[in-house]
Amino acid sequence: MDSLVTANTKFCFDLFQEIGKDDRHKNIFFSPLSLSAALGMVRLGARSDSAHQIDEVLHFNEFSQNESKEPDPCLKSNKQKAGSLNNESGLVSCYFGQLLSKLDRIKTDYTLSIANRLYGEQEFPICQEYLDGVIQFYHTTIESVDFQKNPEKSRQEINFWVECQSQGKIKELFSKDAINAETVLVLVNAVYFKAKWETYFDHENTVDAPFCLNANENKSVKMMTQKGLYRIGFIEEVKAQILEMRYTKGKLSMFVLLPSHSKDNLKGLEELERKITYEKMVAWSSSENMSEESVVLSFPRFTLEDSYDLNSILQDMGITDIFDETRADLTGISPSPNLYLSKIIHKTFVEVDENGTQAAAATGAVVSERSLRSWVEFNANHPFLFFIRHNKTQTILFYGRVCSP
C-alpha cells in the first residue's frame, strides 16, 4: 500500500502543476486521494491503451511489479478476488480498498466524505463483475440513469446526491448545460472535510491585518494568532518555512509551506512550486527537518471553494482515450464498445477558521508564557502552499495554494 501512497502523491504534484500552469496567482484546492480513487474506479474497467494511459499518469505502473514481489499478507484474500477482474487493475483496486478502509475505520475525530460515483446511461448494460469490484474496493456504486430522455432529471439527481454527501456544502455540481442527451457516462467526485484543531485559535486574538498579494498590492484579511508548540522547520533549498498544525488527536495535520517574505512574494512561491517533488516533500516534512518549537503563529482565516472540469486537464496530462468515443475501451465496465467517459467534475470546499477546518466548538490547550526571545515567528501574511495529511498512512487528502485568502 505504501507504493499507492507514493503514486497518489506524485499524481498530486503533477496535477497541481497542470491546474496552475495558466495562472500562477490563483487559489487552488483539490483532493488528490479522491481523484486517484475515482480514476482507479475507471481503471478497474479500462482495457488496452485506455488502461495504460491511466497507469502512466497516475503512476500505477510504477508500483505493481514491486508490490507483487512482496505482497501484503493483509491483501491476500482481496488479490484472489480481484485477480479475475484484471491483474493490474485488480492490484490497484486492492490497495485502494485497503487504504479507503483504513481512512473509514479511524475517522471518529473528523468527518471525511469522499463522494465518488459513476452515473451511466441506462441503455448500456453494466458488467456484474465490475459492479462487485466497485462496491468491494471503492465503497460505492454505479448508477443507471436516463440521460437520453431526461438529462435534466438526471442532473438534479446527481446534484442532490453530492449535496447530501457533502453535508450541504457542495451544491450544483453540474450546471444546467453540463448534462445533455448525448451524455453516456459521468464520473462524480466531491469531497467534504471537517475537523477541529488540536490547539484552537482564540477568537479575541483575530485581527484585521494586511496580506501581501504581490509586490504592489495588499489585502485586508482576518488574521488568526496563536502562541504554542508546533513542529516547524526551515527548507534552505527554497528559502521557506514548513509548519505542522495538528487536528484533534493528531491523526491528521495541515502542513503549511511559507516562502520567506520578499519584495515579490509570488516569485518565492513559484520557485517553491518548481522544486517540490514527492521525495523532497517526504524529506522536508520529516523529523530530521522539523522539530517542536515555541511558535508565534499568524494564519489567515479563509474559505476556498472550487470546481474543476477535468476532461481537458487529464487529456493534457496524457489520459485521452477514455474521453474519445472512437478510442475508449471501457469493456470491463460494459460490453458495449461505444461507452466512453463524457465528463469528470471535481468540486471541493474548505473553510479554515479559529476552531479548525469547518466551524466546530473546541477546547484549547493552555500554553504557558515563555521568554519572548525563544519564540519562533511564522507569519502567513503572503502566498503559501498547504496540504492536509493523514499521518499514519502519509496520505495527502488535500492540497492547495492560497494567493488571496
UniProtKB/Swiss-Prot annotation:
Q: How does it assemble?
A: Interacts with SLFN12; as part of a pathway regulating cell differentiation. May interact with USP14.
Q: Is Oxidoreductase one of the keywords UniProt gives this record?
A: no
List residue numbers at the site (Reactive bond): 370-371
Per the record, the similarity remark reads: Belongs to the serpin family. Ov-serpin subfamily.
- List cystine links: none
What is the role of this chain? Answer: Inhibits trypsin and plasmin, but not thrombin, coagulation factor Xa, or urokinase-type plasminogen activator. May play a role in cell differentiation.
- Name this protein carries in UniProt: Serpin B12
Return the annotated region ranges for Disordered.
64-83
- Localized where? Cytoplasm
Q: Which GO terms describe its molecular function?
A: enzyme binding; serine-type endopeptidase inhibitor activity
Protein species of origin:
Homo sapiens (Human)
Q: Which InterPro entries match?
A: Serpin_CS, Serpin_dom, Serpin_fam, Serpin_sf, Serpin_sf_1, Serpin_sf_2
Q: Which domain of life is it from?
A: Eukaryota
* Tissue specificity comment: Expressed in many tissues, including brain, bone marrow, lymph node, heart, lung, liver, pancreas, testis, ovary, and intestine.
Which PANTHER family does the entry mention?
A: SERINE PROTEASE INHIBITOR, SERPIN, SERPIN B12
Pfam family, any one: Serpin
Q: What is its main location?
A: cytoplasm
Which GO BP terms sit in this record? hematopoietic progenitor cell differentiation; negative regulation of protein catabolic process
Query: What keywords is this UniProt entry annotated with?
Result: Cytoplasm, Protease inhibitor, Serine protease inhibitor
Gene3D superfamilies in UniProt: Alpha-1-antitrypsin, domain 1 (2.30.39.10), Antithrombin, subunit I, domain 2 (3.30.497.10)
In its keyword annotation, does this UniProt entry include Cytoplasm?
yes
